[in-house]
């Protein structure tokens, strides 16, 4: 993203006296970008395959963060990839055993059909590796085990996931769900706040927030957002992210 910005800037205001980017530095950056684009293509293909697999088995796959947020970047495949975060819901919950939620049934299916071992040692998601990429299958949006106060947030997020979402179709016809703009705004802000409190906030996470809000701000109920942001204790943090992003 830095190289994209510099290329745009240098195109309109070329550096004088050969004070631009050194040739070797630019070649190094270009190599990194080409690798990033290759990884993004692989990432996209794996997500589409998983979405098709789950849909055929009767599950709707909601994609959290990552690939969905890359769609708001000026050049989507220049957003670095990471693991794949998903949240699964039954396409038809009638007759389903409520003691075995969608994520649990889907993990069993992954093992039975694909022979993939699933790690269930984590607090609010299971983990497995599909074609070399780590997948986190979330049964919670937030970790309700770490703080009891997170439970009302979890209920809020799950209600929004069930009642409001956006469908996305890949070129191969596979379909998945993205969170609604409101849920995305709350979830990404909360995720960033937790990361900042625990360790740090990196440039990619800040750009995810800034570019998403810039594009979808008209689709967000801001009264609802700020009411819940205050209740979650992250109002000042969100204001700081917004101020830095301007």
Model segments located where?
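Conserved NTP-donor binding/palm subdomain of two-metal-ion nucleotidyltransferases/polymerases, i.e.
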Residues: 1-82, 88-246
């Amino acid at each position: 993203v830095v190289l994209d910005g510099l290329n745009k800037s240098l195109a309109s205001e070329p550096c004088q006296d050969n004070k631009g980017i050194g040739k070797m530095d630019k070649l190094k950056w270009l190599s990194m970008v080409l690798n990033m684009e290759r990884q993004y293509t692989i990432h996209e293909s794996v997500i589409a395959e998983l979405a098709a697999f789950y849909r055929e088995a009767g599950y709707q796959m909601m994609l959290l963060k990552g690939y969905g947020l890359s769609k708001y970047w000026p050049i989507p495949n220049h957003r670095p990839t990471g693991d794949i975060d998903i949240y699964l819901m039954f396409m038809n919950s009638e007759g389903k055993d409520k003691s075995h939620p969608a994520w649990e049934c889907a993990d069993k299916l992954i093992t039975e059909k694909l022979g993939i071992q699933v790690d269930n040692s984590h607090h609010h998601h299971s983990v497995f590796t599909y074609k070399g990429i780590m997948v986190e299958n979330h049964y919670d949006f937030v970790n309700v085990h770490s703080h009891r106060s997170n439970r009302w947030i979890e209920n809020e997020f799950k209600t929004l996931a069930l009642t409001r979402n956006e469908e996305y179709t890949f070129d191969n016809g596979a379909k998945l769900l993205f969170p609604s703009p409101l849920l995305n705004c709350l979830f990404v802000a909360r995720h960033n706040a937790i990361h900042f409190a625990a360790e740090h906030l990196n440039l990619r996470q800040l750009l995810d927030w800034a570019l998403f809000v810039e594009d979808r701000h008209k689709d967000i109920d801001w009264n609802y957002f700020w009411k819940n942001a205050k209740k979650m204790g992250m109002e000042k943090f969100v204001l700081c992210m917004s101020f830095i992003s301007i």
